[in-house]
């Protein structure tokens, strides 16, 4: 029996580019060009924990354009084919990623964690993470949505195995 590693979403195809099958990709990585480290991408719209629903695609050419990637994928040769990819997620297999340093996490590792503060107030689950100029921000949904900065003064403990996060954050914010 083959064990299949789960996929980690690294970006999203946002639009076709030109008439020769190029697509615009919005990366969800710290560095815009990080996706260039992976010559084979998985494309799909489904659950990344079920990679059999995704299709493998090889990158023929790619370049950075502002905060987007312009990419020519093998087998996508005209604008109509490129348009059919719009909205698809770009992922790579988890075991292809380098291990994060101590105290660092992939965003995909943070999504789904249950967040509580030091007073044991349950804030809900991390449903998204986004970058700002200064730091990353967690989107936590429970009884309401909270934006919690992902900085050392606020995030006190992350337990990816236990799926929990302890924060020093006022429940009124």
UniProtKB/Swiss-Prot annotation:
Key words of the record: Chaperone, Cytoplasm, Ribosome biogenesis, rRNA processing
GO cellular component: cytoplasm; ribosome
Entries under InterPro entries matching the protein: PRC_barrel-like_sf (IPR011033), PRC_RimM (IPR056792), RimM (IPR011961), RimM_N (IPR002676), RimM_N_sf (IPR036976), Transl_B-barrel_sf (IPR009000)
Subcellular location(s) per record: Cytoplasm
UniProt superkingdom: Bacteria
GO molecular function: ribosome binding
Job description of the protein: An accessory protein needed during the final step in the assembly of 30S ribosomal subunit, possibly for assembly of the head region. Essential for efficient processing of 16S rRNA. May be needed both before and after RbfA during the maturation of 16S rRNA. It has affinity for free ribosomal 30S subunits but not for 70S ribosomes.
Entry similarity comment: Belongs to the RimM family.
Protein name: Ribosome maturation factor RimM
């Amino acid at each position: 029996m083959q064990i299949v590693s789960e996929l980690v979403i690294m970006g999203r195809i946002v639009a076709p580019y030109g008439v020769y099958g190029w697509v615009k990709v919005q990366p969800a990585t710290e560095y815009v060009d990080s996706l260039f480290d992976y010559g084979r991408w998985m494309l799909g719209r489904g659950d990344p924990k079920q990679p059999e629903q995704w299709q493998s695609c090889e990158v023929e050419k790619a370049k950075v354009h502002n905060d987007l990637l312009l990419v020519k994928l093998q087998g996508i040769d005209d604008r109509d084919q490129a348009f059919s990819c719009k909205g698809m997620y770009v992922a790579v297999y988890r075991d292809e990623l380098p291990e994060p340093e101590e105290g660092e996490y992939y965003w995909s590792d943070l999504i789904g964690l249950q967040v509580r503060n030091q007073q044991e107030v349950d804030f809900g689950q991390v449903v998204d993470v986004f970058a700002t100029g200064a730091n990353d921000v967690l989107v936590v949904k429970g009884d309401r949505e909270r934006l919690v900065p992902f900085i050392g003064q606020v995030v006190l403990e992350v337990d990816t195995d236990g799926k929990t996060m302890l924060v020093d954050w006022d429940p009124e914010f």
